[in-house]
């Protein structure tokens, strides 16, 4: 089948400390190679510093080898909030909650009705977790999502709202699928079918083995990740994820690793110092993940696919705190109790999760009084509050909650190290918040034709989505979030790089990689 590919063009022998728009590629005089597929990997929890430390200390690792022919973006930031759902959606839609309408894994929907209510009431918590599974203790989730647990939409005949239909904008998988390309994605439980996009058709081969079936230790989580890695290896062989049907290698596919995230938070894991030195369990987790990536690279090479595959490694979110001496568990009932003191029954939903608390009010006119109460010094101290976002301060970063019914009325940001969780919780770290340690994630874009470089200009993970489409020869502006938020591709990859992008000094003989005009080619 003839499909659109993209030729990546190399400028050899340039030492460029700074890239500007004037550094354009002469397509006719540069050697070229073709991107025919993109492998997208999220190592959940991976900070930029984690990647840097590992590559430096493991020069023969798969990640080191990929970085030796890749561009490392050292100042990449994931979504705010830095929860798994907005984090992943930023990568696959090119947009923030401003466009996606997905604030967090758990939120309040003022226009939907509770499960099983027959739409007799309106307003309900929506939570896209494994609580929606038929059985969250078995690998296949007991057959997937239980429709009886889904919120209902009274405006559409009281039908259940599946995760994909909650999303407001399309995804890279939908765009690629519509262009006739095969797509695949693998994640940790069935609610991640959201990545298929509003059509529900974006991912041809979706595999969501339930993470709740894995034992709660590093080895158990590694074994769980191994199931997903084998599915990727099957897809590289041109089969479906189960290895049963010959369907061809996807043009866009990938997975999310979980063991590193688990090893960061388990009481025996985490870091040994504030600089990010991994504990033995955390080191074991990243070494295992690296070995898995190595298996993928070897499989691509064995099939002659490696040279035409763009590999992107990033993270949906990071975790905080790195310095375990700063860790303090804050009882997650404190904040809703303070809010309800302002007015009885004022809390529609207080979703306290790790490094953030999001509050939806039954009476939105009370937001100012609630913020004032939470900002009192004694309450700030008891609840570990660093900042309360509401009104104009909230509207500067997201949609107005009066206009967008999915946005919380108040967002509480805790002090670095303070974690909202049930009293007595033993986790060492969490995510979801706005801090540097929550959001500063790894980002590596690798292809055999690249020379090793670092770009230190701040970038967002939203820029991955248009980058992927452009690399596949597709129009990034077909992504609705990209169009709405004017998201650009990552700098340094394409002809006409972003102005003013800073890069480290290249080694002698190193060059820049840039994308020329689309070219037609047969996909292997």
Model-derived segments and their meaning:
Residues 7-18:
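Bacterial N-terminal signal peptides
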Residues 377-407, 474-511, 515:
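Polar, surface-exposed loop/tail segments
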Residues 288-330, 391, 468:
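Metal-dependent active-site segment of extracytoplasmic phospho-/sulfohydrolases and closely related
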Residues 189-212, 239-288, 295, 325-328:
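Active-site His/acidic residue clusters
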Residues 29-35, 48-171, 178, 194, ...:
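Active-site nucleophile/metal-coordination loop of metallo-enzymes that catalyze phosphate/sulfate
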Residues 151, 165-170, 346-474, 523:
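Active-site neighborhoods of enzymes that stabilize oxyanions during catalysis
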Residues 307-309, 315-362:
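Acidic/histidine-rich catalytic neighborhood
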């Amino acid at each position: 089948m003839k499909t659109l590919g993209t030729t990546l063009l190399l400028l050899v022998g340039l030492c460029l400390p700074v890239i500007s728009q004037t550094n354009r590629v002469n397509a006719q005089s540069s050697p070229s190679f073709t991107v025919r597929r993109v492998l997208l990997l999220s190592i959940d929890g991976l900070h930029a510093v984690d990647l840097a430390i590992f590559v430096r200390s493991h020069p023969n690792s798969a990640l080191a080898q990929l970085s030796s022919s890749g561009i490392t973006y050292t100042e990449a930031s994931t979504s705010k909030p830095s929860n798994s759902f907005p984090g992943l959606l930023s990568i696959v839609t090119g947009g923030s909650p401003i466009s996606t309408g997905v604030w967090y894994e758990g939120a309040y929907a003022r226009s939907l009705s509770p499960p099983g209510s027959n739409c007799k009431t309106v307003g309900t918590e929506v939570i896209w977790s494994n609580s929606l599974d038929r059985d969250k203790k078995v690998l296949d989730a007991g057959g997937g999502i239980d429709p009886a647990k889904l919120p209902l939409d009274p405006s559409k005949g009281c039908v259940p709202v599946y995760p994909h239909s909650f999303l407001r904008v399309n995804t890279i998988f939908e765009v690629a699928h519509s262009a006739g390309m095969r797509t695949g994605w693998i994640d940790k439980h069935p609610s991640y079918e959201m990545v298929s996009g509003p059509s529900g058709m974006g991912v041809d081969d979706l595999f969501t083995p339930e993470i709740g079936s894995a034992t709660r230790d590093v080895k158990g989580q590694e074994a769980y990740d191994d199931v997903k890695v084998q599915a990727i290896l099957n897809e590289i062989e041109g089969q479906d994820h189960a290895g049963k049907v010959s369907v061809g290698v996807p043009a866009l596919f990938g997975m999310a690793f979980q063991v590193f995230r688990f090893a960061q938070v388990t009481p025996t894991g985490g870091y040994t110092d504030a600089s990010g030195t991994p504990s033995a369990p955390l080191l074991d987790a990243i070494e295992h993940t690296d070995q898995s990536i190595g298996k993928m690279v070897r499989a691509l090479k064995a099939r002659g696919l490696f040279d035409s595959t763009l590999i992107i490694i990033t993270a949906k979110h990071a975790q905080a705190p790195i310095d375990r001496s700063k860790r303090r568990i804050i009882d997650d009932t404190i904040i809703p109790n303070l809010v309800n003191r302002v007015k009885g029954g004022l809390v529609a939903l207080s979703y306290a999760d790790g490094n953030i608390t999001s509050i939806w009010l039954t009476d939105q006119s009370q937001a100012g009084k609630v913020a004032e109460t939470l900002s009192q010094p004694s309450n700030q101290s008891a609840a570990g509050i660093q900042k309360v976002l509401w009104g104009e301060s909230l509207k500067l970063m997201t949609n107005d909650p009066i206009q967008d019914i999915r946005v919380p009325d108040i967002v509480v940001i805790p002090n670095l190290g303070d974690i909202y969780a049930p009293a007595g919780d033993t986790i060492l770290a969490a995510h979801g918040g706005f801090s540097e340690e929550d959001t500063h994630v790894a980002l590596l874009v690798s292809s055999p034709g690249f020379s090793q470089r670092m770009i230190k200009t701040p970038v967002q993970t939203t820029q991955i989505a248009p980058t992927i489409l452009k690399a596949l020869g597709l129009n990034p502006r077909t992504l609705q979030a990209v169009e709405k938020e004017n998201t650009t591709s990552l700098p340094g990859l394409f002809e006409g790089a972003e102005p003013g992008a800073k890069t480290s000094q290249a080694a002698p003989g190193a060059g820049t990689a840039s994308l020329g005009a689309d070219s037609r080619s047969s996909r292997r």
